[in-house]
UniProtKB/Swiss-Prot annotation:
It is found in: Spore core. Keywords: Sporulation. GO terms for biological process: asexual sporulation; sporulation resulting in formation of a cellular spore. Residues 16-32, 39-53 have a biased composition (Basic and acidic residues). This is Small, acid-soluble spore protein K. It comes from the Bacteria. The keyword DNA damage does not apply. Induction: Expressed only in the forespore compartment of sporulating cells. Belongs to the SspK family. GO terms for cellular component: endospore-forming forespore. Residues 1-53 are annotated as: Disordered. InterPro entries: SASP_SspK (IPR012611).
Length: 53
């Protein structure tokens, strides 16, 4: 059954406000295309940050 029939909210009008959460310091690749080092530490730091919503 389609979402309209179940009265789901219209998700086309949802806009994300503010800056994106993705930060370069947590990215798996650098701007020049090389791979960042210490992936386990990056993933842990990204998961522990509190700058969301």
């Amino acid at each position: 059954m389609r979402n309209k029939a179940h009265n789901f909210p219209n998700q086309n009008n949802n806009k994300l406000e503010g800056e994106p959460r993705a930060k370069a310091e947590y990215a798996s690749k650098r701007a020049d295309g090389t791979t960042n080092t210490h992936p386990q530490e990056r993933m842990r730091a990204s998961g522990e940050r509190s700058d969301f919503f």
